[in-house]
């Protein structure tokens, strides 16, 4: 298993989320299973479980069916949250720039999908 630390701000001394990659890379070179733990001594009212598993799509949808989430789905969630912060009292330049880059990332992934559809290879392991 491999730990991810890209989400940690080096100057932040607070308890951090622990992200673990819990599988081997697939045919495309990317992993599919991630586990997130958050630890803490305080049990909050209405608390949710202190871990989350994220399972990404394994294999082309046309061949394997839908069996996990996509980068696009997770980016859409992050974009929604950033748009909400920008519409509320926590609007700031940093959030605006982050939002723009997330929207741009989603646009490039959509562009890739559209090009694959045009070539007739979307949903397959073909280039």
Outline where the language-model segments fall.
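Homeobox/homeodomain signature
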Residues: 26, 44-46, 97-98
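A short, structured beta-strand/loop element
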Residues: 30-85
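Short, charged/polar N-terminal "headpieces" of proteins
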Residues: 1-41
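Proteins with a high burden of low-complexity, intrinsically disordered sequence enriched in S/T/G/P/A and R
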Residues: 11-14, 68, 72, 93-96, ...
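Charge-rich, acidic-biased intrinsically disordered regions
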Residues: 119-127
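Histidine (H) residue identity feature
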Residues: 7, 32-35, 55, 101, ...
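Short, compact, well-ordered microdomains
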Residues: 80, 85-120
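Glutamate identity and glutamate-enriched acidic tracts
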Residues: 18, 24, 45, 58, ...
